[in-house]
Amino acid sequence: MLLFAVVWGSGACLSVNAATKRPFVLVIDAGHGGKDAGAVGQLTKEKDINLNVALALGRLVEQNCPNVKVIYTRKTDVFVTLQGRADIANRNKADLFISVHTNSSPVGKAAPMGAETYTLGMHRAADNLEVAKRENSVITQESNYKQ
């Protein structure tokens, strides 16, 4: 979040996709939602934190970068399938897709601090596949996940 605040606070906004001459499209995905709570703490659920962060990020972009088109995969506590999230990004020809997730830690452990950013590269395709399988195991909650 700080990186976005610094970049947009300095007035450095992308406004047009140079290759297509159309507005830059940012899709913000609030991870989990609806029947998929994500990590559950004593007082919070990941889906709620993700939604609040995604909406705050979107507002920050909208207020500081009026030429950036912001699209959300969800603005309320609803379940959106993984395919549905991809469809939203693809249908809108997203230039950037940001999926917001938060971590949890076991009770009694020191509270983690900081941020993590994950990107997939082709240099470790086998490892990436295992991560993708683990992260996408939520797909079994979808009614038609065997398709």
Walk through the language-model features, giving the residues of each:
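Bacterial N-terminal signal peptides
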Residues: M1-G11
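Catalytic-core regions of hydrolytic enzymes
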Residues: V16-K146
